[in-house]
């Protein structure tokens, strides 16, 4: 698995340190292939992201000079597809934040603890990110295909072959293999066996 680069940005250095620990604990449940870098200003974060992109950014909204929304706008204007999770004490900003396509929104002063909320969000995030991984399928006629997991609708077993039905393709990709091998290969991606010949992608 490729190491994830995670950024945390908050102008409050005490909160920044606390968030780093909470985020570390939440991700450690699923993987050790990640690094967390912290930034006390939006400008510092954007500069670091330009040098080497982050996949996940936890971003305080209410910061001086360059706000979290300013940072998010720059990221989206540059066509960055990173996952943004806004963190703020101002719940009224949740609707405005939707303009920047955030993955989630964490309230600092919510009744649910930040730790509990973070745990839920990271679980959801890890499941979502798995769907953006690619697999290589070898069709006996059309050759090799790199396919996103989320584009696989379902898999059908037919004699000694597997038919992969892919979003946007009229004909399935036909790869040699058994449904048992397929089950083991895609177990971590939340595929479900609904029949002895079929696996569907949830």
Predicted segments, located by residue:
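Conserved acidic segment of CheY-like receiver
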Residues: 2-23, 57
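Short hydrophobic/Thr-rich beta-strand motif most characteristic of the beta2 strand and flanking loop
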Residues: 27-40
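Acidic phosphotransfer microenvironment of two-component signaling modules
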Residues: 13, 40-44
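Conserved binding/recognition cores within well-folded domains
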Residues: 119-202
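CheY-like receiver
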Residues: 44-129
